[in-house]
């Protein structure tokens, strides 16, 4: 039975959300449509509310397998509020379901420019990359549509949203581990991982650490057994002052290779930045047991000791 709701956009949207959570996608879609009509009839511009309603109705269409209307609504939502993550993800999923892999790839990559830890986008890129390599061959990247450059303002808008809007990112690291670490990569996956890691290395040389993180993350989706990929991504996190992420990546690197000197050094740097001087000194000590004459490590130890005094 449909809920009784008054002619309030907010109440209609809330009722639609409840129906969606209950799996009543048709009813939810109808409520979002009523809210859209009411909002548009008012004549007062509220692009963010209108964008959310289009995006929510798109989610209903996607659940019902109506990919064409999902894409239309996501495009309408993005026209109102460009670079919104949810409509980008939903449109990417719809494109993927329709086997429009190039368009799906563009939307997933756009999401990763906004937040490079969104699990569903990372997993989507993994699937789409395989499909594109199989269908278009080794030069598949040259055959893609242009990938839009996300302005800094859009990235800041996303990072400033309340924490409940970031639920997808909170699980990204654990999803990465469960999705990739429990399987042995094929020879083809190992090669793809190597190529992506090299692309990341080239981006680091050019000073583009944010895009390099994306490449390393893609590489790890194909093969999570390369210690150097984790320690290389840790370097990027350090440059971007993402110290906790750097520490986590170095820890993963050391699980794979307990003598990874760069991982010890970079984790020591991260601990120093986090003011965990005891852990920093412990990593430096471990490093110097492997390379007693490592100059940067000796210098870092002096800096940490000075900070402790």
UniProtKB/Swiss-Prot annotation:
Keywords: Chaperone, Cytoplasm, Isopeptide bond, Membrane, Mitochondrion, Mitochondrion outer membrane, Phosphoprotein, Repeat, TPR repeat, Ubl conjugation. It is found in: Cytoplasm; Mitochondrion outer membrane. The modification Phosphoserine is found at residues 8, 160, 186. SUPFAM superfamilies: TPR-like. It comes from the Eukaryota. GO terms for molecular function: heat shock protein binding. GO terms for cellular component: cytosol; mitochondrial outer membrane; mitochondrion. There is a cross-link at residue 197 (Glycyl lysine isopeptide (Lys-Gly) (interchain with G-Cter in SUMO2)). InterPro entries: CiliaryAsmbly_MitoImport, TPR-like_helical_dom_sf, TPR_rpt. Disulfide bonds: none annotated. Its main location: cytoplasm. TPR repeats lie at residues 9-42, 51-84, 86-118, 193-226, 227-260, 262-294. Residues 158-187 are annotated as: Disordered. PROSITE patterns: TPR (PS50005), TPR_REGION (PS50293). Gene3D superfamilies: Tetratricopeptide repeat domain. The keyword Signal does not apply. It is a peripheral membrane protein. Coiled coil: none annotated. Residues 164-178 have a biased composition (Basic and acidic residues). PANTHER family: MITOCHONDRIAL IMPORT RECEPTOR SUBUNIT TOM34 (PTHR45984:SF2), RNA (RNA) POLYMERASE II ASSOCIATED PROTEIN HOMOLOG (PTHR45984). Belongs to the Tom34 family. Interacts with HSP90A, VCP, ATP6V1D, KIAA0665, AMPK, and DMAP1 through its TPR repeat. Plays a role in the import of cytosolically synthesized preproteins into mitochondria. Binds the mature portion of precursor proteins. Interacts with cellular components, and possesses weak ATPase activity. May be a chaperone-like protein that helps to keep newly synthesized precursors in an unfolded import compatible state. This is Mitochondrial import receptor subunit TOM34. It comes from Rattus norvegicus. The gene is Tomm34.
């Amino acid at each position: 039975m449909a809920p009784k709701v008054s002619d309030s956009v907010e109440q209609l949207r809330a009722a639609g959300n409840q129906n969606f959570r209950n799996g009543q996608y048709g009813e939810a879609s109808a409520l979002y449509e009523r809210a859209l009509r009411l909002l548009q009839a008012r004549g007062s511009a509220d692009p963010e509310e209108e964008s959310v309603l289009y995006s929510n109705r798109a989610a209903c269409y996607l659940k019902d397998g109506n990919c064409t209307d999902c894409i239309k609504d996501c495009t309408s939502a993005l026209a109102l509020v460009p670079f919104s993550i949810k409509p980008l993800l939903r449109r990417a999923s719809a494109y993927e379901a329709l086997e429009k892999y190039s368009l799906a790839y563009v939307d997933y990559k756009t999401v990763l420019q906004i937040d490079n830890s969104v699990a569903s986008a990372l997993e989507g890129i993994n699937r789409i990359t395989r499909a594109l390599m199989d269908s278009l061959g080794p030069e598949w990247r040259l055959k893609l549509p242009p990938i839009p450059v996300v302005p800094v303002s859009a990235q800041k808008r996303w990072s400033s949203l309340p924490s409940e809007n970031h639920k997808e990112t909170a699980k990204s690291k654990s999803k990465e581990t469960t999705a990739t670490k429990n399987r042995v990569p094929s020879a083809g996956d190992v090669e793809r991982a190597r190529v992506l890691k090299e692309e990341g290395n080239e981006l680091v040389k050019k000073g583009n650490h944010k895009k390099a993180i994306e490449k390393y993350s893609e590489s790890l989706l194909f093969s999570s057994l390369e210690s150097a990929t984790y320690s290389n991504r840790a370097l990027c996190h350090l440059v971007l002052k993402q110290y906790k992420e750097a520490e986590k990546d170095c820890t993963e690197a050391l699980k794979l290779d307990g003598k990874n000197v760069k991982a010890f050094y970079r984790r020591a740097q991260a601990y120093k930045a986090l003011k965990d001087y005891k852990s920093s000194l412990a990593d430096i000590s471990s490093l110097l047991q492997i390379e007693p004459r490592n100059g940067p490590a000796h210098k870092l130890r002096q800096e940490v000791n000075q900070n402790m005094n």
